Amino acid sequence: LFCKRQTAFLPDNPDIYAFMTGIQFLNFIADIFGVSAEDRQKRIREYADRFELTADLAQPIAAYSHGLKQKLAIISAWIHEPKLILMDEPFVGLDPKAAHLLKEMMREHCDAGGAIFFSTHVLEVAEKLCDKVAIIKQGRLIKAGTMEEVKGNDSLEEVFLELEAE
């Protein structure tokens, strides 16, 4: 239980209870993780404002677009302030402004001592955000290390394409 409270997982296609409203869902997740009423209210307000989701929280999730569902899922992953966040393709469905905000949140989380593992096919995002990187081919780790160790003087895309050709 302790480990679960320290982690969050954001799948590439999160299952969100469509019969709930956004605020009901976030309160449900906060209840699961024991987030106090005061902390949850503050965090929901902060993240919903940042993602411009506040006006939509009273609406049923069934009416949300893919992008709104993704924003809600991101907030639900952050609501209990986990130390480790695992994300699978977190930028899919986000508009450019929300994607930029997520990048900022990821950097803030790491700067505050947290860690994030995420998968992406957008190598420029990995190159800009990551301190360490791993390249996986057909389920096997083929290269890993700091960004400098992996890419040297090349771009991450060039390294990836070279490794794919092997």
Describe the function of each predicted region.
Residues N27, D31, D39-D56:
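Conserved ABC ATPase "signature" region
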Residues I85-E89:
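Catalytic Walker B motif of ABC-type/P-loop ATPase nucleotide-binding domains
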Residues A126-K128:
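A short, surface-exposed alpha-helical micro-motif characterized by mixed small hydrophobic
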Residues P60-G67:
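Conserved ABC ATPase signature
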Residues A99-A112:
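Helical segment within the ABC ATPase nucleotide-binding domain
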